[in-house]
Amino acid sequence: MKKIPVTVLSGYLGAGKTTLLNSILQNREGLKIAVIVNDMSEVNIDAGLVKQEGGLSRTDEKLVEMSNGCICCTLREDLLIEVEKLAKDGRFDYIVIESTGISEPIPVAQTFSYIDEEMGIDLTKFCQLDTMVTVVDANRFWHDYQSGESLLDRKEALGEKDEREIADLLIDQIEFCDVLILNKCDLVSEQELEQLENVLRKLQPRARFIRSVKGNVKPQEILHTGLFNFEEASGSAGWIQELTAGHAEHTPETEEYGISSFVYKRRLPFHSTRFYRWLDQMPKNVVRAKGIVWCASHNNLALLMSQAGPSVTIEPVSYWVAALPKLEQEQVKQQEPEILEEWDPEFGDRLTQLVFIGTDLDEETITKELDQCLLTEYEFDSDWSLFEDPFKWKLNQ
Protein backbone atom coordinates (compact mmCIF):
# COMPACT_ATOMS: atom_id res chain seq x y z
CA MET A 1 0.00 0.00 0.00
CA LYS A 2 1.37 3.35 -1.06
CA LYS A 3 1.78 5.78 1.84
CA ILE A 4 -0.11 9.08 1.61
CA PRO A 5 2.09 12.16 2.14
CA VAL A 6 0.94 14.66 4.78
CA THR A 7 1.68 18.37 5.18
CA VAL A 8 0.88 20.09 8.49
CA LEU A 9 0.31 23.86 8.66
CA SER A 10 1.09 25.55 12.00
CA GLY A 11 1.20 29.21 12.98
CA TYR A 12 -0.32 31.59 15.49
CA LEU A 13 -3.89 32.87 15.16
CA GLY A 14 -4.29 35.26 12.23
CA ALA A 15 -0.94 34.41 10.59
CA GLY A 16 -2.68 33.37 7.37
CA LYS A 17 -2.87 29.55 7.46
CA THR A 18 -6.39 29.34 5.99
CA THR A 19 -5.51 31.81 3.22
CA LEU A 20 -2.41 29.73 2.42
CA LEU A 21 -4.47 26.52 2.40
CA ASN A 22 -7.01 28.02 -0.01
CA SER A 23 -4.21 29.26 -2.27
CA ILE A 24 -2.76 25.72 -2.40
CA LEU A 25 -6.17 24.14 -3.07
CA GLN A 26 -6.93 26.55 -5.90
CA ASN A 27 -3.64 25.58 -7.61
CA ARG A 28 -3.49 21.88 -6.75
CA GLU A 29 -3.17 20.75 -10.39
CA GLY A 30 -5.29 17.61 -10.26
CA LEU A 31 -4.14 16.34 -6.84
CA LYS A 32 -6.98 14.77 -4.86
CA ILE A 33 -6.49 16.36 -1.45
CA ALA A 34 -8.16 15.51 1.85
CA VAL A 35 -8.14 18.47 4.22
CA ILE A 36 -8.40 18.45 8.02
CA VAL A 37 -9.11 21.83 9.60
CA ASN A 38 -8.76 22.15 13.37
CA ASP A 39 -10.45 25.06 15.16
CA MET A 40 -10.69 25.75 18.90
CA SER A 41 -14.19 27.23 18.67
CA GLU A 42 -17.41 25.21 18.47
CA VAL A 43 -18.13 26.64 15.02
CA ASN A 44 -15.24 25.87 12.65
CA ILE A 45 -15.00 29.21 10.83
CA ASP A 46 -11.79 28.26 9.00
CA ALA A 47 -13.42 25.12 7.59
CA GLY A 48 -16.26 27.29 6.27
CA LEU A 49 -13.77 29.53 4.47
CA VAL A 50 -12.03 26.50 2.93
CA LYS A 51 -15.39 25.18 1.71
CA GLN A 52 -16.23 28.53 0.10
CA GLU A 53 -12.86 29.38 -1.42
CA GLY A 54 -10.86 26.15 -1.73
CA GLY A 55 -13.02 24.67 -4.49
CA LEU A 56 -12.94 21.11 -3.12
CA SER A 57 -14.80 18.59 -5.29
CA ARG A 58 -17.55 16.77 -3.36
CA THR A 59 -16.88 13.43 -5.02
CA ASP A 60 -13.08 13.27 -5.17
CA GLU A 61 -12.05 15.25 -2.12
CA LYS A 62 -12.96 15.67 1.51
CA LEU A 63 -12.94 18.30 4.24
CA VAL A 64 -12.85 17.05 7.83
CA GLU A 65 -13.73 19.59 10.52
CA MET A 66 -12.23 19.08 13.98
CA SER A 67 -13.72 21.67 16.31
CA ASN A 68 -13.85 22.65 19.98
CA GLY A 69 -10.40 21.34 20.86
CA CYS A 70 -6.77 21.09 19.77
CA ILE A 71 -5.20 18.25 17.75
CA CYS A 72 -1.96 18.48 19.73
CA CYS A 73 -3.76 17.34 22.91
CA THR A 74 -7.55 17.09 23.48
CA LEU A 75 -8.39 15.99 19.91
CA ARG A 76 -5.29 13.88 19.30
CA GLU A 77 -7.25 10.59 19.37
CA ASP A 78 -9.80 12.02 16.92
CA LEU A 79 -6.94 13.02 14.61
CA LEU A 80 -5.55 9.46 14.66
CA ILE A 81 -8.96 8.00 13.79
CA GLU A 82 -9.73 10.53 11.02
CA VAL A 83 -6.33 10.20 9.35
CA GLU A 84 -6.52 6.40 9.43
CA LYS A 85 -9.99 6.59 7.80
CA LEU A 86 -8.77 8.94 5.07
CA ALA A 87 -5.69 6.81 4.38
CA LYS A 88 -7.70 3.58 4.13
CA ASP A 89 -10.29 5.24 1.90
CA GLY A 90 -7.86 5.04 -1.03
CA ARG A 91 -9.29 8.04 -2.93
CA PHE A 92 -6.74 10.63 -1.89
CA ASP A 93 -3.30 11.59 -3.15
CA TYR A 94 -2.46 13.90 -0.27
CA ILE A 95 -3.58 15.04 3.21
CA VAL A 96 -3.18 18.65 4.37
CA ILE A 97 -3.83 19.49 8.02
CA GLU A 98 -4.40 23.03 9.26
CA SER A 99 -3.70 23.12 13.01
CA THR A 100 -5.41 25.57 15.30
CA GLY A 101 -3.37 28.71 15.98
CA ILE A 102 -2.54 27.64 19.55
CA SER A 103 -1.31 24.17 18.58
CA GLU A 104 2.29 23.09 19.15
CA PRO A 105 3.73 21.21 16.15
CA ILE A 106 5.79 18.54 17.97
CA PRO A 107 2.83 16.52 19.40
CA VAL A 108 1.16 16.58 15.96
CA ALA A 109 4.35 15.31 14.30
CA GLN A 110 4.64 12.59 16.96
CA THR A 111 1.16 11.37 16.01
CA PHE A 112 2.53 10.48 12.57
CA SER A 113 5.91 9.23 13.74
CA TYR A 114 5.07 6.73 16.49
CA ILE A 115 2.65 3.84 17.02
CA ASP A 116 -0.23 4.60 19.38
CA GLU A 117 -0.31 1.34 21.33
CA GLU A 118 -3.29 2.38 23.46
CA MET A 119 -5.52 2.80 20.41
CA GLY A 120 -3.76 0.21 18.27
CA ILE A 121 -3.29 2.70 15.41
CA ASP A 122 -0.02 2.91 13.50
CA LEU A 123 -0.20 5.82 11.05
CA THR A 124 3.35 5.06 9.86
CA LYS A 125 1.82 2.16 7.86
CA PHE A 126 -0.47 4.46 5.87
CA CYS A 127 1.08 7.93 5.93
CA GLN A 128 4.37 9.69 5.44
CA LEU A 129 4.76 13.05 7.17
CA ASP A 130 6.18 15.08 4.29
CA THR A 131 6.45 18.71 5.44
CA MET A 132 5.94 20.71 8.63
CA VAL A 133 5.07 24.29 7.69
CA THR A 134 4.98 27.29 10.05
CA VAL A 135 3.30 30.51 8.94
CA VAL A 136 4.52 33.73 10.60
CA ASP A 137 2.70 37.07 10.41
CA ALA A 138 5.49 39.47 9.39
CA ASN A 139 3.38 42.45 10.42
CA ARG A 140 2.40 41.34 13.94
CA PHE A 141 5.26 39.04 14.96
CA TRP A 142 7.15 41.49 17.19
CA HIS A 143 3.90 42.83 18.68
CA ASP A 144 2.86 39.31 19.74
CA TYR A 145 6.34 38.13 20.70
CA GLN A 146 7.07 41.08 22.97
CA SER A 147 3.56 41.46 24.40
CA GLY A 148 4.27 39.53 27.62
CA GLU A 149 0.73 38.14 27.36
CA SER A 150 -0.43 34.59 27.92
CA LEU A 151 -3.10 32.71 25.96
CA LEU A 152 -5.35 33.12 29.01
CA ASP A 153 -4.89 36.91 28.86
CA ARG A 154 -6.20 36.86 25.29
CA LYS A 155 -8.94 34.29 26.07
CA GLU A 156 -7.34 31.87 23.60
CA ALA A 157 -6.27 29.14 26.06
CA LEU A 158 -7.37 25.50 26.08
CA GLY A 159 -8.68 26.01 29.61
CA GLU A 160 -7.84 27.61 32.94
CA LYS A 161 -4.82 25.34 33.40
CA ASP A 162 -3.31 26.34 30.04
CA GLU A 163 -0.76 28.89 31.25
CA ARG A 164 1.33 29.10 28.06
CA GLU A 165 2.84 32.43 27.10
CA ILE A 166 2.31 33.64 23.53
CA ALA A 167 6.07 34.12 23.01
CA ASP A 168 6.72 30.48 24.02
CA LEU A 169 4.08 29.22 21.58
CA LEU A 170 5.56 31.30 18.72
CA ILE A 171 9.01 29.88 19.50
CA ASP A 172 7.68 26.29 19.58
CA GLN A 173 6.16 26.80 16.13
CA ILE A 174 9.30 28.41 14.67
CA GLU A 175 11.82 25.97 16.13
CA PHE A 176 10.08 22.86 14.73
CA CYS A 177 9.45 23.25 11.00
CA ASP A 178 10.81 22.42 7.56
CA VAL A 179 9.37 25.43 5.75
CA LEU A 180 8.81 28.85 7.32
CA ILE A 181 6.47 31.16 5.44
CA LEU A 182 6.76 34.86 6.22
CA ASN A 183 3.28 36.05 5.31
CA LYS A 184 1.79 39.56 4.95
CA CYS A 185 5.12 40.88 3.65
CA ASP A 186 3.30 43.74 1.91
CA LEU A 187 2.46 45.27 5.29
CA VAL A 188 6.06 45.90 6.42
CA SER A 189 9.03 47.75 4.93
CA GLU A 190 11.85 45.86 3.20
CA GLN A 191 14.26 46.78 6.00
CA GLU A 192 11.89 45.50 8.72
CA LEU A 193 11.35 42.33 6.71
CA GLU A 194 15.10 41.76 6.27
CA GLN A 195 15.72 42.16 9.98
CA LEU A 196 12.84 39.86 10.98
CA GLU A 197 13.89 37.20 8.49
CA ASN A 198 17.47 37.27 9.73
CA VAL A 199 16.37 36.93 13.36
CA LEU A 200 14.11 34.01 12.43
CA ARG A 201 16.93 32.37 10.45
CA LYS A 202 19.05 32.56 13.59
CA LEU A 203 16.26 30.92 15.58
CA GLN A 204 15.62 28.30 12.87
CA PRO A 205 18.68 27.81 10.62
CA ARG A 206 17.47 24.58 8.97
CA ALA A 207 14.12 25.64 7.48
CA ARG A 208 13.44 26.87 3.95
CA PHE A 209 12.19 30.47 4.08
CA ILE A 210 9.48 31.74 1.75
CA ARG A 211 8.05 35.26 1.65
CA SER A 212 4.40 35.60 0.74
CA VAL A 213 1.57 38.09 0.34
CA LYS A 214 -1.95 36.82 1.15
CA GLY A 215 -0.62 33.26 1.48
CA ASN A 216 0.26 33.07 -2.20
CA VAL A 217 2.73 30.17 -2.33
CA LYS A 218 3.34 27.58 -5.05
CA PRO A 219 2.00 24.13 -4.03
CA GLN A 220 5.37 22.46 -4.73
CA GLU A 221 6.93 24.65 -2.00
CA ILE A 222 4.98 22.80 0.72
CA LEU A 223 3.69 19.59 -0.92
CA HIS A 224 5.87 16.61 -1.87
CA THR A 225 9.02 18.30 -0.54
CA GLY A 226 10.23 15.18 1.32
CA LEU A 227 11.86 17.50 3.88
CA PHE A 228 10.51 16.09 7.14
CA ASN A 229 12.78 14.07 9.39
CA PHE A 230 11.77 13.88 13.06
CA GLU A 231 15.29 13.68 14.43
CA GLU A 232 16.58 16.55 12.27
CA ALA A 233 13.55 18.72 13.02
CA SER A 234 13.94 18.10 16.77
CA GLY A 235 17.55 19.33 16.66
CA SER A 236 17.07 22.17 14.19
CA ALA A 237 16.52 25.07 16.62
CA GLY A 238 19.22 27.74 16.53
CA TRP A 239 20.08 27.36 20.22
CA ILE A 240 20.70 23.60 19.77
CA GLN A 241 22.85 24.24 16.69
CA GLU A 242 24.95 26.73 18.67
CA LEU A 243 25.48 24.27 21.53
CA THR A 244 26.36 21.28 19.35
CA ALA A 245 28.39 23.00 16.66
CA GLY A 246 30.00 25.81 18.65
CA HIS A 247 29.82 29.21 17.02
CA ALA A 248 28.04 28.97 13.72
CA GLU A 249 29.33 30.99 10.81
CA HIS A 250 27.91 34.48 11.03
CA THR A 251 26.65 35.64 7.67
CA PRO A 252 27.14 39.24 6.48
CA GLU A 253 23.33 39.70 6.55
CA THR A 254 23.07 38.91 10.26
CA GLU A 255 26.02 41.18 11.03
CA GLU A 256 24.47 43.99 9.01
CA TYR A 257 21.36 43.87 11.19
CA GLY A 258 23.30 43.39 14.43
CA ILE A 259 22.00 39.86 14.97
CA SER A 260 24.41 37.67 16.89
CA SER A 261 24.70 34.75 19.27
CA PHE A 262 27.12 33.37 21.82
CA VAL A 263 27.44 30.52 24.31
CA TYR A 264 28.05 31.15 28.02
CA LYS A 265 29.76 28.13 29.61
CA ARG A 266 31.01 27.78 33.19
CA ARG A 267 32.03 24.99 35.58
CA LEU A 268 30.93 26.85 38.71
CA PRO A 269 27.37 26.95 40.07
CA PHE A 270 25.20 30.05 40.24
CA HIS A 271 24.00 31.50 43.52
CA SER A 272 20.25 31.06 42.95
CA THR A 273 19.22 34.46 44.32
CA ARG A 274 21.68 36.45 42.20
CA PHE A 275 20.86 34.44 39.08
CA TYR A 276 17.12 34.84 39.72
CA ARG A 277 17.55 38.62 39.96
CA TRP A 278 19.59 38.65 36.76
CA LEU A 279 16.88 36.72 34.89
CA ASP A 280 14.40 39.34 36.03
CA GLN A 281 16.47 42.12 34.41
CA MET A 282 17.77 40.25 31.35
CA PRO A 283 18.53 42.70 28.51
CA LYS A 284 15.48 43.25 26.30
CA ASN A 285 17.49 42.75 23.11
CA VAL A 286 17.94 39.05 23.96
CA VAL A 287 15.40 37.45 21.61
CA ARG A 288 16.03 33.86 22.69
CA ALA A 289 18.07 32.19 25.42
CA LYS A 290 18.07 28.57 26.40
CA GLY A 291 20.28 25.99 28.03
CA ILE A 292 21.24 23.93 31.06
CA VAL A 293 21.94 25.63 34.39
CA TRP A 294 23.80 24.51 37.53
CA CYS A 295 22.52 26.20 40.70
CA ALA A 296 24.17 25.60 44.08
CA SER A 297 20.88 25.34 45.98
CA HIS A 298 19.79 22.49 43.66
CA ASN A 299 23.16 20.81 43.30
CA ASN A 300 21.78 17.42 42.24
CA LEU A 301 19.43 18.76 39.56
CA ALA A 302 20.11 19.93 36.02
CA LEU A 303 17.86 22.94 35.41
CA LEU A 304 16.54 24.04 32.03
CA MET A 305 16.32 27.79 31.47
CA SER A 306 14.21 28.95 28.54
CA GLN A 307 13.57 32.55 27.53
CA ALA A 308 11.45 33.81 24.64
CA GLY A 309 10.79 37.55 24.62
CA PRO A 310 9.48 38.57 28.07
CA SER A 311 8.74 34.95 29.03
CA VAL A 312 11.38 33.23 31.20
CA THR A 313 11.05 29.78 32.75
CA ILE A 314 13.49 27.69 34.75
CA GLU A 315 12.71 24.16 35.88
CA PRO A 316 14.41 20.87 36.75
CA VAL A 317 14.75 18.43 33.83
CA SER A 318 16.85 15.61 35.27
CA TYR A 319 19.43 14.63 37.86
CA TRP A 320 23.05 15.29 37.02
CA VAL A 321 24.68 11.95 36.21
CA ALA A 322 27.29 12.79 38.87
CA ALA A 323 24.48 12.89 41.46
CA LEU A 324 23.38 9.31 40.75
CA PRO A 325 24.59 6.26 42.72
CA LYS A 326 27.90 4.91 41.37
CA LEU A 327 26.33 1.83 39.72
CA GLU A 328 23.78 3.96 37.83
CA GLN A 329 26.53 6.41 36.84
CA GLU A 330 28.52 3.61 35.21
CA GLN A 331 25.45 2.34 33.36
CA VAL A 332 24.69 5.81 31.96
CA LYS A 333 28.34 6.30 30.93
CA GLN A 334 28.27 3.01 29.02
CA GLN A 335 24.97 3.86 27.30
CA GLU A 336 25.96 7.47 26.56
CA PRO A 337 29.78 7.56 26.23
CA GLU A 338 29.65 11.14 24.87
CA ILE A 339 29.06 12.28 28.48
CA LEU A 340 32.70 11.48 29.20
CA GLU A 341 33.85 14.15 26.71
CA GLU A 342 32.59 16.85 29.09
CA TRP A 343 33.22 14.95 32.35
CA ASP A 344 35.10 16.89 35.02
CA PRO A 345 37.11 14.97 37.68
CA GLU A 346 35.63 17.11 40.46
CA PHE A 347 32.15 18.12 39.27
CA GLY A 348 31.28 15.34 36.82
CA ASP A 349 28.76 16.55 34.23
CA ARG A 350 27.66 19.58 36.26
CA LEU A 351 28.04 22.80 34.28
CA THR A 352 26.12 25.77 32.91
CA GLN A 353 25.72 26.14 29.14
CA LEU A 354 23.48 28.94 27.91
CA VAL A 355 22.93 30.12 24.34
CA PHE A 356 21.98 33.76 23.75
CA ILE A 357 20.52 34.99 20.45
CA GLY A 358 19.61 38.64 19.96
CA THR A 359 20.16 41.99 18.31
CA ASP A 360 23.12 44.20 19.22
CA LEU A 361 24.07 41.86 22.07
CA ASP A 362 26.76 43.07 24.44
CA GLU A 363 28.44 39.70 25.03
CA GLU A 364 31.09 41.15 27.32
CA THR A 365 28.58 42.81 29.68
CA ILE A 366 26.22 39.81 29.78
CA THR A 367 29.16 37.48 30.50
CA LYS A 368 30.45 39.78 33.24
CA GLU A 369 27.01 40.05 34.87
CA LEU A 370 26.52 36.27 34.78
CA ASP A 371 30.00 35.71 36.24
CA GLN A 372 28.94 37.89 39.17
CA CYS A 373 26.07 35.45 39.79
CA LEU A 374 28.51 32.54 40.28
CA LEU A 375 29.50 31.44 43.78
CA THR A 376 32.39 33.37 45.29
CA GLU A 377 35.32 31.43 46.75
CA TYR A 378 33.93 32.00 50.25
CA GLU A 379 30.43 30.82 49.22
CA PHE A 380 31.86 27.79 47.44
CA ASP A 381 33.49 26.61 50.69
CA SER A 382 30.35 27.18 52.79
CA ASP A 383 27.20 25.06 53.26
CA TRP A 384 25.19 25.42 50.02
CA SER A 385 21.99 24.12 51.63
CA LEU A 386 21.81 27.32 53.71
CA PHE A 387 21.53 29.57 50.62
CA GLU A 388 18.22 31.31 50.06
CA ASP A 389 16.30 29.69 47.18
CA PRO A 390 13.90 31.91 45.19
CA PHE A 391 12.84 29.10 42.83
CA LYS A 392 9.67 27.73 44.40
CA TRP A 393 9.26 24.42 42.61
CA LYS A 394 6.92 21.74 43.79
CA LEU A 395 9.25 18.85 43.13
CA ASN A 396 7.79 15.40 42.84
CA GLN A 397 10.49 13.51 44.70
Swiss-Prot record:
Disruption phenotype: No effect in wild-type, but required for optimal growth in strains lacking the ZnuABC zinc uptake system. The keyword GTP-binding applies. It is an enzyme of class 3 (hydrolase). Residues 259-374 form the CobW C-terminal domain. CDD domains: CobW-like. Its EC number is 3.6.5.-. GTP binds at residues 11-18, 73-77, 183-186. Induction: Repressed by zinc via the metallo-regulatory protein Zur. Keywords: Chaperone, GTP-binding, Hydrolase, Nucleotide-binding, Zinc. One of its GO terms (molecular function) is hydrolase activity. The keyword Zinc applies. Zinc chaperone that directly transfers zinc cofactor to target proteins, thereby activating them. Zinc is transferred from the CXCC motif in the GTPase domain to the zinc binding site in target proteins in a process requiring GTP hydrolysis. Contributes to optimal growth under starvation for zinc. This is Zinc chaperone YciC. The gene is yciC.
